[in-house]
Amino acid sequence: MQYQEFLNLTAEKIAPGTASEVRKFIAVTLSTLGERLYRTGRDELSAQLPKELKGDLYLEVDGEAVRTDTERFPLEEYYQRVAARADLPYPRAVEISRKVMEVLAGAVTPEVLAAVKSRLPEEYDQLFGDAPDSPTSPTAV
């Protein structure tokens, strides 16, 4: 998938939003995912993303991507980080995160997506739309 197509599909799914807001939401969502993945997962995923999005999976210092160790945090914290970084209410951060992941799922091969998901705790299936919200899910509240 090309960069502009990724942006356009994301914009359609998360409307309303300006082009710069959509780009910010993608960057925040992918960078937060990148923090949760081990380097091999980030590398596999970034290899299939448009070049303009590759750096979003890595911490950047002075414009250069820096590989970091993974951080282990639950799905609720993932959504909280997205909400804080994108200056969004929590429910909107959940919605946008899921929509970006929906576009991401169409941008990479099923094998890479499965490999990435296998490296995350089961609760992250909700992020990818593969599991319903449970009664104790932060998104069900």
What are these regions (language model features)?
Residues 13-15, 19-22, 85-98, 102-103, ...:
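A domain-level signal for the structural core that forms small-molecule/cofactor-binding pockets
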Residues 56-111:
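Short, solvent-exposed interaction modules
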Residues 6-9, 28, 61, 81-82, ...:
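Generic signature of intrinsically disordered, low-complexity segments enriched in small/polar residues
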Residues 1-39, 76, 102:
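The feature marks the first
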Residues 4-5, 20, 43, 73-77, ...:
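Generic alpha-helical secondary structure signal
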Residues 2, 36-65, 107-139:
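Extended intrinsically disordered, low-complexity coil regions enriched in Ser, Thr, Gly, Ala
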